[in-house]
Amino acid sequence: MQMSDISFGVTDWSKVERTEHKGETGMAYWRTQTFGGIRVRMVEYTPGYLADHWCSKGHIILCLEGELHTELADGRKFILTAGLSYQVADNAEPHRSRTRVGAKLFIVD
């Protein structure tokens, strides 16, 4: 990843517009900024959220609050809690996430 054409700045995430995204169950609320072609998001999943698709996009995800369960297409499963992160490349390992208790995430892709 090459970070270029990004001036120094501070983001107050509480002031970034929140958009709703329905899961198979539950909701995801995104606050999204783009910096030089890099998408950066603060995402909140409601309790009971299950993604409505298998994702093949690459991400770096840091769990800030709650608990995120991620399953890979090959059957492996991982749990993130506050302070844990995962990273995956584009088109590398399809994955799908869920949460029983809700989760707040910081995502770079």
Put a short name on every predicted segment.
Residues 45, 54-70:
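Short, conserved beta-strand element in jelly-roll/cupin
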Residues 85-88, 101-109:
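A short hydrophobic beta-strand segment most commonly corresponding to one strand
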